[in-house]
Amino acid sequence: MENLNSYFDLFDQSRTSEQAFEELVGLFSDDIVFVLNGHEKQGIENWKLFVKMVFKENADIKHMFEGWKAVEGTDKFETPWAVCGKRASGSVFTQTGKDIAKLDENGKISYLENVPGDTNMFDTYKN
């Protein structure tokens, strides 16, 4: 659970800190499965590409989350989140949604699903 609790802060810090980026990557298993608005990707290298894409498209971002809770009857955890940011174009945005995660036997994040309120949020990362 410690890795889940560190995730959002490290994600935001990773935009300007290579050390935070390495710590962020260390939260995940090498074979991470992540789902962005219904589009599944696999592997830590694809995860790193996604994070870099977010930072290329956004000049600044800040996440808030309510707290990870176990999903009854499953091995998953979830939390509602909100993010505000400034795109590279200069426009500002807000977004809400939820993340669903699983941890492996070592406590690393092995599955992460991002379910944004805006279904177009990750259109640029479908391919």
Listing of model-derived features with the role each one plays in the protein:
Residues 55-127:
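A beta-strand edge to alpha-helix "cap/lid" segment located at domain peripheries
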Residues 1-11, 35-38, 54-59, 80-81, ...:
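Short, mixed-charge, low-aromatic patches
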Residues 5, 32, 48, 95-97:
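A generic structural signal for ordered secondary structure
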Residues 21-25, 29-75:
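A solvent-exposed, acidic/Ser-Thr-rich amphipathic alpha-helical stretch
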Residues 9-16, 29, 52, 56, ...:
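Generic surface-pattern signal
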Residues 1-27:
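Short acidic-aromatic low-complexity motifs
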